[in-house]
Regions:
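Hydrophobic membrane-insertion alpha-helices, especially the h-region
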Residues: 4-22
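Generic intrinsically disordered, low-complexity segments enriched for polar/acidic and small residues
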Residues: 16-19, 24, 66, 88, ...
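Acidic/histidine-rich, surface-exposed loop or edge segments in extracytoplasmic proteins
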Residues: 17-21, 101-117
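Short, non-transmembrane alpha-helical segments in secretory-pathway proteins
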Residues: 23-60, 116-157
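Generic low-complexity segments that are intrinsically disordered, proline-rich and/or Lys/Arg-biased
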Residues: 29, 95-96, 103-104
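Exposed beta-strand-loop-beta-strand "reactive/processing" segments of non-cytosolic proteins
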Residues: 47-96, 144-198
Length: 199
């Protein structure tokens, strides 16, 4: 009799444990948890990155009817340098098969528009690199070499003077009385103008 009662109690405890384990999802399913989990993962995978930010989050439904979030993040290394590296990282939450998509390199090794036949300067990092690597930017390239503390600020503009759809990238240095601004076309792989100013 005692054995039967003990077996019944163990069975009840086992069923209760199974119910608790399978009733609650392994990953909490809300947007804030997805963002938190993703940012923690980015901090671990890219500990030296200066910028790690979520650009987009979308809730989707998989073929089996379960809900998940698809996230896209920006990771930038060397944002204060002439050659910042920008990576886009994609992630599904909860993770599917624990196989993530490979990161997409937007800029790498001081190059823009990697594997793109027609270059569109869509991001700050691209504009900064283009401002001293495109044809016609020799003055800025020399300025950067002569001033190790040179830094750039980039602004996307709908219009500037007679130009439309441009980036303005201004290079300045505390150790120089000069600054340079490159006016770049967003879509034509072209330097439209180099402006030299005395500070």
């Amino acid at each position: 009799m005692k054995t039967v009662v003990l077996v019944v109690l163990l069975a009840i405890v086992a069923l209760g444990a199974i119910y608790i384990i399978f009733q609650q999802p392994a990953y909490p399913m809300n947007e804030n948890d997805a963002k938190k989990f993703f940012l923690e993962d980015l901090r671990e995978k890219y500990p030296n990155a200066g910028i790690r930010e979520i650009m987009d989050i979308t809730q989707l439904t998989s073929s089996d009817g379960s809900s998940y979030y698809q996230l896209k993040a920006r990771v930038t290394n060397g944002e204060g340098t002439p050659c910042p590296e920008r990576i886009h990282v994609y992630y599904d939450y909860p993770p599917k098969n624990y196989v993530s998509q490979p990161p997409e390199y937007i800029t790498k090794s001081c190059k823009v528009c990697i594997n793109e036949p027609h270059c569109i300067l869509a991001f700050t990092e691209e504009a900064i690199i283009a401002s001293h690597t495109y044809n016609g930017t020799g003055e800025i390239e020399k300025f950067i070499k002569d001033n190790s503390d040179a830094a750039a600020t980039a602004s996307a503009m709908d219009s500037y003077g007679n130009y439309t759809g441009v980036w303005l990238v201004k290079w300045s240095s505390p150790s120089s009385a000069l600054s340079y601004t490159a006016v770049l076309s967003k879509t034509q792989n072209t330097v439209l103008e180099i402006i030299k100013e005395s500070n």
